[in-house]
C-alpha cells in the first residue's frame, strides 16, 4: 500500500513555486547595483527599482524577471541579453538603451519612452506596448522605427 504523503510532495513543490516566494533577488546584487549602477549577470528577480535614476547603468545578462522599473530613468542603460519577462516598465525612460537580445515576454512597457533604443533580437511576445514611443528605435529585425511609431514600429 502506497502512502498518500508521496503524492503531496509534488503538490507542495508546485505551490511554493506558484507563490514565487523562492524566486527573490539576491540582496548583495541589489546593493552592488544601487551603489555602482553596474551588475552584470545579476539575480534581481522581483527587485523594486521604481522611480530611480539609473542612466547609463549596466545590467547586461541579468535576470530581472518581474522587476519593477515603474517611472525609472534608464537612459542609455545596457540591458542586453537580460530577462525582463513580466517586468513593470510603465512610464520608464529607455531612451538610447541597449535591449539587444533581451527577453521582454509579457513585460509592461505601456507609455514607456524607447526613442533610439536598440531592440535587435529582443523577444516581445505578449509585451504591452500601448502608447510606447518607438521613434528612432532599432526594431527586433534591425530596421529603424519611423516617425509616428507609437505602440508599434512603423518601418
Residue map of PLM features:
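Bacterial N-terminal signal peptides that target proteins for export
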Residues: 1-9
